[in-house]
Amino acid sequence: MNFKRKLWWAQHRTDVYKYSTFILLFLIVTISIIYFTYSKFTSKNEMTMYETTVEPFIKNDYFIASYIDGEWSNEIPGKEDGYVVDKVVCDNGAIGTWNNDKWAILIENATKKTKCSVYFELRYIDNVIAEAPELAQGMIPVTFDDAGNAVVADTHAKWYDYEAHEWANAVLVNCADNAIKSKYFDSNNKVLASAVGKTISMDEIMQMYVYIPRYKYQLFNAENGTSNPQAINIVFESKTTAKSTGTKNGEWLTHPAFTFGDKELAGIWVGKFETSNTSELPKIVPNVSSLRDMNVSAQFNTSRLMTTTLASTYGTSTSDDSHMMKNMEWGAVAYLSSSIYGRYTNTSTCIDSGCEVWINNNSNFVTGCAGSSVSSSEASTCNAWNTATGVNASTTGNIYGIYDMSGGASEYVMGNYNDVIKNAGFDSMPESKYYDKYIGTDYYADFTKYYLGDATKETLKAKLTEENAWYGDYSKSVSSFYPWIERGSNCYDASVAGLFSFNVVYGNSYSTFSFRVVLSVL
């Protein structure tokens, strides 16, 4: 038997070596192809870059899977191909973040071999803003028809144009009603393709929002001087771009409103109108009386409902954050409005209705109204938001802007002097990310305590209180006596009301005070 085996081996040894070598090479090639398919992807334009904060891991410890419009792909789209990253999902507790500037993935908290799946979606981008708007869960992107009706937008096609002063808009519908929810969303809370082009009834809409993309601006009055109304130079940027940190005139500053706690935001969604309906079920819609007679604490608590206890009603996620507008966020809207993307056509020319946002002079505090002129006295009549005159009261001078920021109700914002609660109703101040804290001299005429970007000390025509902000709007500084900030003034204030108006108050409820909601995608 042993002799036969030896004889067989002697006769077939060469063949065995040959086929074994072939099989081994085949396995090596196959394994290599599989490995490199999952660990490295290249586009036609450039090599992707992978970074990690964990040592001693190297590139080969990560496996990257690419999905384009839901389908697996063995390559990633190029940076200029019109795709955006919808999400990055990593296993084993790792966190993946996509860097749009480098067109690369950053992997953190990896403790073992890690696979990250990157989901790319084709979305429209207008080549002006740096990133396509990040829609929160439950948001339906919309455009407006000639009658002012909200129409479900196709995010693969043009639905905003910041160069043409058409800011991105989105709505939340009543997802507590299954008939409404199933009309617009699939089981994964994605907007149905079949919903595109449908008109959304105002009865279905709970809230309307406008997108303020992340930007940096060129400092024009950074050293506690004075200035006149002007077109502010703005450059849009990605949240992964290194922040500009200028402090002097002519330098650039990434607007602070786009830093929320320890998160850098691609933009913020701002309530299109003052808040309305009830404190238990807040709405943001036109043609209704705004929600008033609430102290700051009650307003703040109401603003949080959309991403906390009432998230299922609005279709939103508790992973995102709705909150009461901060003073700095008001400033971000004001500066974008005072730019070539808002009410200027170029650096020296205003749009037809002027550079100043027109007042909402409706004495019943109806949202979205406009007076017959920029500073009309109060009246019970209303030029509605979707009329030729009504759009003059928006930040863009058209239907795509934000309303009620001049007149309407006075708006409390989350800006406070040195944690003095006064009559606001808080037991203690909320987390620091939810308000702008001002310190410095306890004097109402000292404006140096304000910050760059909040549209206060930079937009003073004279360093005096009362009618000395841009366009003669009201100006006053917080102190321990009046620790809370009010913006915009109200319908009774005529010429001192405006986008750049800032006053100070106790924080208690008033029949003329409302508030605004901001929603951040985290």
Task: Give a label for each model feature.
Residues 98-124:
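Conserved "repeat-terminator" motif of extracellular CCP/Sushi domains
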Residues 1-16:
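N-terminal Lys/Arg-rich, disordered targeting/topogenic segments
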Residues 15-68, 125:
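Short, polar/proline-rich extracytoplasmic segments that appear immediately after membrane translocation
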Residues 62-84:
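Solvent-exposed, low-complexity, repeat-rich "mucin-like" stalks and linkers
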Residues 125-250:
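N-terminal module-boundary/linker segments of secreted carbohydrate-active enzymes
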